[in-house]
Amino acid sequence: MMIPFKVKTFSFLLACACSTAGMAQVGNDSPVKQVKISGYVGTRITDCIEHRVKAQDVDHLVEPFRHQNEKSRWQSEFWGKWIQGAIASYRYNRDPELYQIIKDAAESLMATQLPNGYIGNYAPEYQLQQWDVWGRKYTSLGLIAWYDLSGDKKALEAACRVVDHLMTQVGPGKVDIVSTGNYIGMPSSSVLEPVMYLYNRTKENTGHRTKRIKRYIE
């Protein structure tokens, strides 16, 4: 579907932009499978994808996850934010080169997962502080988005393990999540978003993980 840009189509474009926020939801019954925007806005979108999304040094985003020595900063949010944008871009243009970039980015990130499930860059004694859980949220969202696009079960498993590990640290009898991080735990508590997405994707299973995620939500 080719959409020429006009002022009267602004509401349609806004709806398209907002629809990416629901990318991690299950199911899409829309008969529209792809939209192509032309004109000035279409050119700007293409330029953004070519010269910003595809040009990103992905290894630079992954590198912090290879070193668990952070105490306070938020580098761990960037990979998850970038890959969600890259996946939305791929859904728009179906560029096979971009797909490979995304695939490589996901596999590089998953390779940093520790045996206990942690994916992040905070030193063990500083985990749960500052922006650590916030970064885990974006990591999980990015892995889920890749799973939704590719069907790669390794990504879903990696995201589940991230949450599994977090639940060994927070919850009843452990650290109260609202006491972690900044702003009375609001950034940390937003990890509930990927937790709910994981529940939606694993609730048909009867294993311990699904029950633990359900209990965490409740």
Predicted regions and their residues:
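Glycan-recognition and catalytic cores of secretory/periplasmic carbohydrate-active enzymes
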Residues: 24-218
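Bacterial N-terminal signal peptides that target proteins for export
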Residues: 1-11
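Bacterial N-terminal signal peptides
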Residues: 11-19
